């Protein structure tokens, strides 16, 4: 018996070791830029000289972000697609669940796609989520769930965040679906950005069709498992609970089901184009980074807003290539303010390499950590979405960005970036440091310094996973 147990233990140990080695070592072998995709970029028109059919509204406020989501869901007549990396059954996540549940009760078809890790962490035991998932016309897909069959692919996550309504409008950005990013909370939050896109051409908008096609592809991936909620013995009470939450939302926001000023409250754009990294749960070609590099080829000024920077040598080469012909500015959270310890720690290790690319860096001391991901290319193009300037977003995760040809949006975001720069410590490529007019210095306490000193050593072998 002891020999059998010993053999079982050895087999389990070897399997666990294999899982760890595959998940740590495989991401080290990053895919190179895709030549076929490079050709596609050259054949794609990212600008137009006249206004197109798709109109936009830029959402930078967390409470407004919740309101627009509720309006979109509340006015849906036929179909809703919600794809999100991190949905939680907290206060504002539950408000979304309640709105979706009410829409389902009216016969609206709902498809909900969630990343497998966060579904397991935050929704598996949620009665509200199970109640919604058990509705007849609600389908739930879980991307790359954490199961024995998927253990060798645990690194490949779905980082998308978008909402599609009735094939006539969508919202896409960097916000997750929880209290950190939605609602009127004032503590423990992040700032972020969404773009609401309204199509005036009755479902023929170019980027809307691109996003719908993308969703169909990822929904049909073999790594997506279909889940159906289990209605509990108290499911009637739970349905009533969600309806009560929705009723309270209608009292607070009177136009959730009657709002109709979509065209009036949005701005025209010349063109919107969706770019992405692919849908498979596997190593990705760096398509989003390729697109940013291509769009910046003839630029004179490029601003990159990212929560943090975690680059390999190939990514540093891209930044250096941009800085060789353009003024390159990178705005990121200061270590003293950032909410991601891995990103902060890697910055401490890699700061000199980032500056060596020729980029000027702005260490932002905002009131709240900034989770926004955006690239401004001269005064016309804005690239907005879920892509962080790190190896995970570049080579491992699914990512979506919108390339928007709109001088007005570019100016709006540029104004926000100017304010962020005033709240930052500017570090020029030559090492010269200057505090912005609104910069408020914060000193790390000894515990935080010690914590980062330890992490600086620990993360070196696994920085490709952060």
What are these regions (language model features)?
Residues 2-138, 148-156, 165, 169-466:
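Charged, low-complexity intrinsically disordered terminal segments
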Residues 141:
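Phosphate-binding P-loop/Walker A region and its immediate neighborhood
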Residues 145:
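Short loop/turn segments at beta-alpha junctions that line or gate ligand-sensing/allosteric surfaces
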């Amino acid at each position: 018996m002891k020999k059998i147990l010993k053999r079982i233990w050895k087999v389990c140990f070897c399997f666990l070791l294999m899982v760890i080695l595959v998940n740590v070592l495989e991401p080290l072998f990053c895919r190179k830029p895709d030549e076929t995709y490079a050709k596609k970029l050259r054949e794609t028109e990212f600008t137009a000289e006249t206004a197109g059919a798709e109109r936009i509204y830029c959402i930078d406020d967390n409470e407004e972000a919740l309101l627009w989501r509720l309006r979109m869901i509340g006015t849906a007549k036929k179909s809703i697609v919600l794809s999100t990396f991190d949905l939680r059954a907290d206060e504002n996540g539950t408000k979304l669940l309640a709105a979706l549940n009410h829409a389902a009760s009216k016969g609206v078809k709902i498809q909900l796609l969630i990343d497998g890790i966060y579904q397991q962490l935050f929704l598996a035991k949620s009665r509200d989520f199970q109640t919604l998932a058990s509705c007849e016309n609600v389908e739930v897909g879980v991307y790359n769930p954490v199961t024995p069959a998927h253990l060798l692919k645990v690194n490949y996550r779905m980082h998308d965040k978008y909402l599609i309504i009735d094939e006539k409008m969508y919202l896409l950005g960097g916000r997750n679906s929880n209290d950190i990013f939605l609602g009127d909370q004032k503590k423990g939050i992040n700032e972020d950005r969404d773009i609401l896109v309204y199509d005036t051409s009755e479902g023929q908008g170019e980027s809307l069709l691109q996003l719908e096609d993308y969703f169909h592809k990822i929904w049909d991936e073999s790594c997506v498992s279909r889940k159906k909620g289990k209605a509990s013995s108290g499911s009637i009470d739970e349905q009533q609970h969600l309806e009560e939450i929705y009723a309270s939302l209608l009292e607070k926001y009177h136009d959730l089901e009657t709002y109709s000023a979509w065209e009036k409250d949005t701005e025209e754009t010349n063109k919107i184009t969706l770019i992405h990294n692919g849908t498979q749960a596997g190593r990705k070609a760096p398509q989003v980074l390729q697109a940013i590099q291509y769009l910046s080829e003839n630029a004179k000024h490029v601003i990159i807003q990212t929560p943090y920077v975690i680059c390999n040598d190939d990514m540093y080469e891209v930044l250096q290539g941009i800085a060789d012909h353009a003024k390159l500015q990178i705005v990121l959270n200061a270590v003293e303010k950032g909410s991601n310890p891995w990103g902060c720690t890697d910055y401490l290790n890699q700061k000199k390499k980032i500056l060596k690319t020729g980029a000027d860096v702005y260490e932002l001391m905002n009131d709240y950590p900034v989770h926004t991901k955006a690239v401004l290319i001269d005064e016309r193009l804005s690239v907005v979405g879920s892509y962080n300037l790190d190896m995970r977003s570049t080579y491992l995760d699914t990512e979506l960005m919108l390339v928007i040809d709109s001088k007005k949006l570019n100016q709006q975001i540029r104004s926000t970036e100017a304010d962020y720069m005033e709240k930052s410590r500017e570090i020029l490529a030559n090492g010269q440091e200057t505090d912005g007019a609104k910069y408020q210095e914060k000193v790390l306490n000894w515990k935080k310094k010690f914590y980062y000193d330890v992490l600086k050593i620990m993360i070196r072998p696994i920085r490709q996973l952060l």
